[in-house]
């Protein structure tokens, strides 16, 4: 991190319009995978005042009540009356999902599952850093925690005047690659019209900001921007149109690592935009957890219909205990990055995806979930179960 003395990342809440769209897309994916785990799904969502539109391509034997899924997601987030500007019970729902192209299917499907081709060409990145306990960059970690806490305070009634839409931004100061302070915090939260700015600022500072940001990182010159425009009453899909896939930096590393451009939500694991990015995080996190490097960024790339990656590249930014070339060899020896192998390695054919669609896909804690008769672990790409093998293979 020596190239930056300050670095800023942002996050958004589950009630942000783009995140509503992401959660709807992944809820549709989950419902289909729960019935047909080998389904091919690409679901896009648009939300605006009074309407939610879902579109895309699906190949499945399952039947799911798409309208009910869409409404439940919106209601669960907290948009349940015209007073907050959007109501999942009464909004219009339009479904224009079609079938997957047979040209794509013939390029992906194989008689031998392990030969499954990539669902599209593309490049994906994975990243890890030892600057936080979850091996993620601090600015995006704190940003996620702020909007998560906002949702907790809203839903629990701790701050009853909060509404679902919110955004956060955190600027961290670095010295020699380590976080030594937080220079600026921005938190904008939707609220009802009855709360005064004084009460809002005090409540947010005491029960959200100070609850999240470690006190030793705050200093006399830290800037706090709480609802800097004053009022934030109109929010959610009324304030802005929401679309699936528009928060790809929020979803990943907050700009600290590069991004191949592909979004995650609404895509089944045959789409390497999603599964290979998860695998990249898994590889990078295990490299850092093994002590092979303090920071690691990995890039993989694919050609449509081809199983083997077209490239695997790696950068430890001068923090590696071994050369990057030697670490790449360890990656090739210990991780199979073909699409089917990724799906198997990370056990991705379960309805786990709506949980990923807000507050970041990375830096989360692996958790056991049960949906119907299916019990599985979500966020498997956050496990560090390959670290010991990597350390041993490296001779450390």
From Swiss-Prot:
Binds 2 divalent ions per subunit. Binds 1 potassium ion per subunit. GO terms for cellular component: cytoplasm. It is found in: Cytoplasm. It catalyses: L-methionine + ATP + H2O = S-adenosyl-L-methionine + phosphate + diphosphate. InterPro entries: ADOMET_SYNTHASE_CS, S-AdoMet_synt_C, S-AdoMet_synt_central, S-AdoMet_synt_N, S-AdoMet_synthetase, S-AdoMet_synthetase_sfam. Mg(2+) binds at residue 18. K(+) binds at residue 44. Pfam families: S-AdoMet_synt_C, S-AdoMet_synt_M, S-AdoMet_synt_N. Keywords: ATP-binding, Cytoplasm, Magnesium, Metal-binding, Nucleotide-binding, One-carbon metabolism, Potassium, Transferase. Pathway: Amino-acid biosynthesis; S-adenosyl-L-methionine biosynthesis; S-adenosyl-L-methionine from L-methionine: step 1/1. GO terms for biological process: one-carbon metabolic process; S-adenosylmethionine biosynthetic process. Residues 100-110 are annotated as: Flexible loop. Its EC number is 2.5.1.6. It comes from the Bacteria. ATP binds at residues 16, 165-167, 240, 246-247, 263, 267. The keyword Cytoplasm applies. The keyword Zinc does not apply. Gene3D superfamilies: 3.30.300.10. This is S-adenosylmethionine synthase. It comes from Pseudomonas syringae pv. syringae (strain B728a).
